Amino acid sequence: MISPVSSIPRSAHRSRPEATPYLDLTRAEWSALREKTPLPLNAEEVEKLRGLGDVIDLDEVRDIYLPLSRLLNLYVGATDGLRGALNTFLGEQGSQSGTPFVIGVAGSVAVGKSTVARLLQALLSRWPEHPRVELVTTDGFLLPTKELEARGLMSRKGFPESYDRRALTRFVADIKAGKDEVTAPVYSHLIYDIVPGQKLTVRRPDILIVEGLNVLQPALPGKDGRTRVGLADYFDFSVYVDARPEDIERWYLNRFRKLRATAFQNPSSYFRRYTQVSEDEALDYARTTWRTINKVNLLENVAPTRGRAALVVRKGPDHKVQRLSLRKL
C-alpha cells in the first residue's frame, strides 16, 4: 500500500509555504479589516499629527491605522475578559482592578514611529471603551548630556547604554501596577537634553503608548547572571515600524534639511551652528551622523528586535505602508 505522504510528488513538498509565526498581509488585505469602523479624524487633525518629512494623509490613516485601532480595541476588550476570568478564579482570595493596556512602538530614527504613536493615541482615544490614552517617548529617559559626556557616550546617544533603562522599566512597571500617579523626565529636542526640573505626570490611563528606538530590547542579565525583567515584558502589544536602511537614510537627510530651515534657526537650538555653514557642509555632517551613529544603532540594536514585535509595519520608499506582519496567537 502506498502511504499518503510518499504518494505526493517532491515538487508538491517544495511548494508548501514555509511555516512562520506571522500572518503576512498586503496593504489591500489589511485595509479590508477595518470593516465599517468610522474615521474620527479629519485632514487638518492628521496634518497636526504628522511628523516632519513623514508623508501621511487620510487614505493612509483609513487604510492602515484605522484597522490597527480596531484590532487594538479588540485586544483591550479581550484583556479585560481575561482579567474577569482571573478574578473569577481568585474569588475571595483577591481580585484585580483594571490596569493600563501598554503598547510599545519601535523603529529607527526617521522611520516615522513618532507619527505612528501619535496617530494611535488620537484614534484609540476616540473609542468609548478607552478614552484616556497617554503617550510617552523614551527620550525622557536618556542620560543628561553632562553624564553622557562624562561617560564618553555622546557619540552613542540613542544606543541602549545611553538610557537610564532601569528608570524607564520602573516607570512602566509602576503604571502597569496601577499606581495613581507616575512621573517621567522631560526631554527637549531644542536643547538636545533633559529639561531640568520638568516632569511629565501620567495618571492611570486606559492605554499607555511607549515610543522609542529600543523599547523591544531584551533585558540585560544582572551582575549575578540572573535574567531581569525587561521593558517589553510589560507590553500587551507592540509595533515595529520597518523600512529599508537606504530609504530611512534619505528620509533622515530630508528631515535634516527641513529642520535646518526651521527649528535649527532658533537661537536656543543645540544645532544652530549648522545653519551658519553651507548646506553642503551641514549635509556632510548629517550623512556622517547617519552612517556612524544612527545606521550602526539600527543594524546592531534596533532591527534585531523586529522579531519581538506583535505587528511589523513595512514601509516602501514613499513612506507608504506596503505590507504588515501580524504575529499569530
UniProtKB/Swiss-Prot annotation:
Pathway terms, separated by semicolons: Cofactor biosynthesis; coenzyme A biosynthesis; CoA from (R)-pantothenate: step 1/5
Record key words, sorted: ATP-binding, Coenzyme A biosynthesis, Cytoplasm, Kinase, Nucleotide-binding, Transferase
Subcellular location: Cytoplasm
Family matches, as Gene3D superfamilies: P-loop containing nucleotide triphosphate hydrolases (3.40.50.300)
Bridged cysteine pairs (disulfide): none
Protein's UniProt name: Pantothenate kinase
GO molecular function: ATP binding; pantothenate kinase activity
Pfam family, one: PRK
Binding-site residues for ATP, renumbered to this chain: 107-114
Enzyme class: transferase
Gene designation per UniProt: coaA
